[in-house]
Amino acid sequence: MNAGDEVIVPSYTFVSSALAFVRQGAKIVYADSESDNPNIDTSTIEKLITKKTKVIVPVHYAGVSCDMDAIMGIACRYNLLVVEDAAQGIDSYFTSPKTGLKTSLGGIAHMAAFSFHETKNIQCGEGGLLIINDERLVRRSEIIWEKGTNRAEFYRGEVNKYGWVDLGSSFLPSEYTAAFLYSQLCELEKIQLSLIHI
């Protein structure tokens, strides 16, 4: 992602969907929502694509899946990355009308992000989860996650010492946070059922 690159985001979303890209100097291009829900209207995406477009960010609003067949098809035609904003998509699925295949949200695009904000079904106050579904993105993601170091490669025995190789930050959860999240995952079905009745 370079300054001036463009990212297509639905017009109805929280600021976090665009913020990571804006911090890298990207220009946000807003796509219309569907007429019957706030998800991205896939029929509006192609006319927004330019030579500077790099990423499409479908937001699965309230855990309702976007048309990922259409979005991934467009991304393939134009050689674009897709980053699913699955912040509200824990335990939600996309069923392909083409194949009938049911896939977890976050498991379709090149990358996906889930939120553990206190307003989500599974929460720990703040934080989230990054899913990497494209091998080309794993190394850089690990470096950013490990404070800019190649420590993950060191732990796997791929290098004999680790060092700073890029920019990064500290994204590691505490053991308490992980335990709190794990206990909710163990009770996910019960949590989801209780929310249906609210």
Range-by-range predicted roles:
Residues M1, L105-G106:
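Hydrophobic beta-strand core residues of beta-sandwich domains
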Residues M1, N79-L80, S170, K190:
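A subset of signal/propeptide-processing and intrinsically disordered low-complexity segments
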Residues N2-Y93:
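PLP-dependent aminotransferase-like
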Residues T53, R77-N79, T103, G127, ...:
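A generic hydrophobic-helix recognition signal that picks specific residues
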Residues Q88-P97, L101, I108-S194:
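Active-site region of PLP-dependent enzymes
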Residues I196-I198:
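Conserved small/polar residues in nucleotide/adenosyl-binding loops
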